[in-house]
């Protein structure tokens, strides 16, 4: 079981930052399938991350062991023993209708990334782990899930209950932060 957000009297803002602190990419899971209520909460989290217009994002919640096994064999980057998958997809036709070419190439990807991020932050609050998977061929994923040509798979989220002794995350990750202009270090201004 992964660390979960402590049930304290902290403010909602503190709870969000604690969930961010606990966020991990898990690559080894137990064989136990997370409960339907947990998967429903992840779907809810993805829905709250909306960047694009309604109807652009589609989610496929995959729990059929045979289908998960097919994904495992067909997608080289897939986490080997995750018992569930959420496939985040974009409707390119609808995106083009309501937002034009930029909607297709930029907004759909931002929308899918936001959904993946919200799922990732929600996971430790539910006692589960996730891992974003992006190493696969679009056509293969479309074929596995029967996606029409105008539905593009964006991200596969491996979902499961992490093993007890999972590796600790790399500490100290921080992006390069600039102030006002590229090359001006943010820390020099504080």
Language model segments and positions:
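N-terminal amphipathic, basic helical "cap/leader" segment at the start of enzyme domains
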Residues: 1-85, 89-95, 188-190
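Small-aliphatic-rich amphipathic alpha-helix that forms the alpha element of a beta-alpha
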Residues: 46, 86, 102-144
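A short coil-to-beta-strand element that immediately follows conserved catalytic motifs
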Residues: 56, 128-132, 152-153
